[in-house]
Amino acid sequence: MKVKIKKLVENAIIPTYAKDGDAGMDLTATSKTYDEHGNVVYGTGIAIEIPKGYVGLVFPRSSICKTDLLLTNSVGVIDSGYRGEIMAKFTYMHMHNKKYEIGDRIAQLIIMPYPTIEFEEVDELSETERGEGGYGSSGK
């Protein structure tokens, strides 16, 4: 599937798969700023045109465990109508460990289809083995 991409800055890097069979394409930082709360905002210098019926999801890379960073919205959602720069905002858990710099791969992008959902209000839901069991209900 082809997706249109626009470089917004000269040093932008087109996302690629690191290895054959990977689901996520690496996003690379081209800018680094801080918001009013001290969170670090990385720009990728790219904008994409996601087809209707698809969504872009921005996840932290697995190597984030080597940093003190936490993606502030857990998973970024890029709707098909968005045409702005893809960015990732992180909060610092501690101030004394590795942080990402410009040129580092900061996150990963997955583009996937999604169904359009229409809710049907009912009085009862079907029975299941789990039922209403929530947190911890499946055991240790």
Spans of features found by a protein language model:
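DUTPase catalytic domain/fold
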Residues: 1-140
